[in-house]
Amino acid sequence: MKILVTGGLGLIGHNVVQKLVKLQHEVFIIDNSTNYGFIPVKQLSYLISERQKKIPGVFTYQTDLADIESVERIIDNIKPDTIIHLASFPRQKVVNANPVLASTVMSTALLNLLECCKKYSIPRFIYTSSSMVYGDFEDYVTEDAICKPKGQYAIMKLAGEWLIKDYAKFGIGYTILRPSAVYGPLDVEDRVISKFLLTAMRKECLKVNGKNETLDFTYVDDAAEGIVQASLSENTIDKTYNITKSHSTTLYQAALLALNIVGQGEVEVREKDEDFPSRGALDITKAKQDFGFDPKVDVAEGFKIYYEWLKNDPYWQSSLIDKS
């Protein structure tokens, strides 16, 4: 099967591509190698280079998805059976810092892809949304819950879901996936678990915004496996799924776990960031039933795997020395 993965050089994306290649699919990537976040150029370049090493032989189109002519040429040339759309602004604070560019990246790019699916009769479109679309929720939120998005990132993600559902009338079989708090090796520093582990490794104070705020932390390999399973299953057409570990962990618990694994550091608890919704665990019963989704890595194991990678990775070794 020919599969086009947008954002295929991202944290989740390169793991998805690896799995598809192992399954002997013909995979292509569109990625402009930009994070849009608060990431040093040196760090981003290193991470992208390391991700590329894990997917040798997969051709990457360095293209802006907002450029409709370029996107049309690529899709017309490949004629993929499925598009897995992972490219996006990465998280809420990045959207808040540049909402106009975010709209181009998250909305215009999606519309361009859907127009190409319509024009070239692409039968399947997989959209990676976010657990943020639910807004405030407690354990265990199901896919049919009323979405009350909080903030522009969540609103744009939910708008994308509705846009995709509208394009289904053109014969595009869609699948919408909602992951949560994905982490793991080759992630950028500017995420919760990355920050906790690296801050502890630097013997600095971990800052927790809201002691009892919870997240459904999901190890990257589990998230990627769920995305691949959903993308290849006929049972998922025109449906929406939660793709998470389905276990809530408070930020304070996560911080203490990071300290315990690293063996040093301290925690400072601050007020909750009101720009972010209060979230719990997501219910993954539907994904289990429809395509056998079964996340393997719990938070304690995932944190340890990530820490061991950080501890032994040359970039982070030098980074820790520079800041010591």
Placement of each model-derived feature along the sequence:
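C-terminal substrate-binding subdomain of Rossmann-fold SDR/epimerase-dehydratase oxidoreductases
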Residues: 200-324
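Residue-level signature of the cytosolic catalytic core of signaling kinases
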Residues: 67, 185-189, 247, 295
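Short alpha-helical
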Residues: 11, 90, 187, 249-250
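N-terminal Rossmann-like NAD(P)+-binding domain of SDR-like oxidoreductases, especially those catalyzing
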Residues: 1-178
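NAD(P)-dependent short-chain dehydrogenase/reductase
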Residues: 139, 150-153, 162-215, 220-229, ...
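Residues in well-ordered alpha-helical elements
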Residues: 69, 81, 93, 100, ...
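A short beta-to-alpha transition loop/helix N-cap that caps and shapes the active-site region
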Residues: 36-38, 135-137, 185, 251, ...
